[in-house]
Structure formats: C-alpha cells, structure tokens
C-alpha cells in the first residue's frame, strides 16, 4: 500500500527558533527538517533563527516576540525554549518528536484535518489568526 503523495499548490512558510546546545533542536534539524523538505519541497519556505547568535540577537528577539505574541495562552515557562516552530498562519509546535508524525501534523494543519495527538515532547500552540483552532 503506497503512501498517497500530496500535491502542494501553494507556498507555505515555516519559521523556527533553535538553540545550538539543545538536543531536541538538533534532532529537529537533522531528522525533522529533511522530512519536511521531502514532503513539501519548494512549497515550504523555511527560515531559522539561532537564539544564541549574538550578532542577530536583536532581530531574532524581535521576531521571536512577534511570533510569541500571536499565540493564544502561551505558557511563559516555555519562553526561550526550542525548537519553537511556526507554520505561519496555521499553528506553532514546541518540541519535536518522530519526524514522520511531525510532517503529518503540518500536513493535517494545512489540509484543515484533525491533528493527531502531539508527542509527549511536543506542545501545540494555536495562533490568534491561525487557520487551525483548538478543537
């Protein structure tokens, strides 16, 4: 039985914030990002921000704050943790579990389908103007 390949027409935007020494961020970069690229190809524009980089710190902090401000009921205890991933206009996910499941979260969000349960390490966040709303 073959996995039905999705045909993406639009371009989506993913913004993520990471820390160099965070093992889950490394897992996201090494395993999850390639899986996202494989699924979406050129239809997913990805922008990353290193939360440790002093040279881009001010720009990163402003962008991070703007993104956090879009979240409904953000848990301040999660502030500054990574990987913090925003599927622009849809939702945000803090933490990354299995890469295939993660890609499925994004696919379901974009298609407007019910999200699978988040992995233990993941937290779904909903955006004030996001297309995905808490069910």
PLM region descriptions:
Residues 7-21:
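Short active-site neighborhood of thiol/selenol oxidoreductases, capturing the structured segment around
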Residues 17, 41-60:
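Thiol-based oxidoreductase modules, predominantly thioredoxin-like and allied folds used
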Residues 19-23, 47-49, 92-94:
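Second-shell loop/turn segments in exported
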Residues 20-27, 84:
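C-type cytochrome heme c attachment motif
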Residues 25-40:
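Typically the conserved alpha-helix immediately C-terminal to a functionally engaged Cys/Sec
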Residues 29-33, 57, 61, 103, ...:
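Extracytoplasmic/secreted envelope proteins and their assembly/folding machinery
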Residues 61-91:
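Short, structured active-site "lid" loops
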Residues 79-132:
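Non-catalytic, surface beta->alpha helical segment in thiol-disulfide oxidoreductase systems
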